């Protein structure tokens, strides 16, 4: 399950998974998704804390670089919200 974290001005939606526990190692997957003018979506997923890209469809290298910088500034918050099941908004 993924929980919405934020929507950027360019309509990119960033969402995160719950905490995944693999042999005592905690990780979070972060999904980036944006509508394409041709139809469908640009989509990419990155695993934290390794910053390993799991897949990427249609995002440019510049986009991925921006997302990596975003993740570097938000990883601690994404882990925090992942541990409590997403941001609680009414």
Give the residues covered by each predicted segment.
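A short, structured beta-strand/loop element
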Residues: 15-59
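Acidic, low-complexity intrinsically disordered segments
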Residues: 56-90
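Generic intrinsically disordered, low-complexity segments enriched for polar/acidic and small residues
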Residues: 2, 13, 29, 56, ...
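Sequence-level detector for tyrosine residue identity
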Residues: 3-5, 51, 58, 81
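Negatively charged, low-complexity tracts enriched in Asp/Glu with abundant Ser/Thr
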Residues: 1-19
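Ser/Thr- (and often Asn-) enriched beta-sheet segments in non-cytosolic proteins
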Residues: 5-7, 45-47, 88
């Amino acid at each position: 399950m993924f929980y919405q974290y934020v929507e950027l001005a360019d309509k990119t939606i960033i969402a995160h998974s719950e905490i995944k526990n693999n042999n005592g190692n905690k990780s979070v997957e972060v999904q980036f998704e944006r509508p394409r003018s041709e139809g469908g979506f640009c989509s990419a997923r990155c695993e934290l804390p390794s910053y390993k890209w799991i897949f990427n469809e249609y995002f440019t290298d510049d986009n991925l670089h921006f997302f990596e910088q975003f993740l570097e500034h938000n990883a601690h918050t994404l882990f925090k919200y992942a541990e409590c099941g997403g941001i609680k908004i009414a």
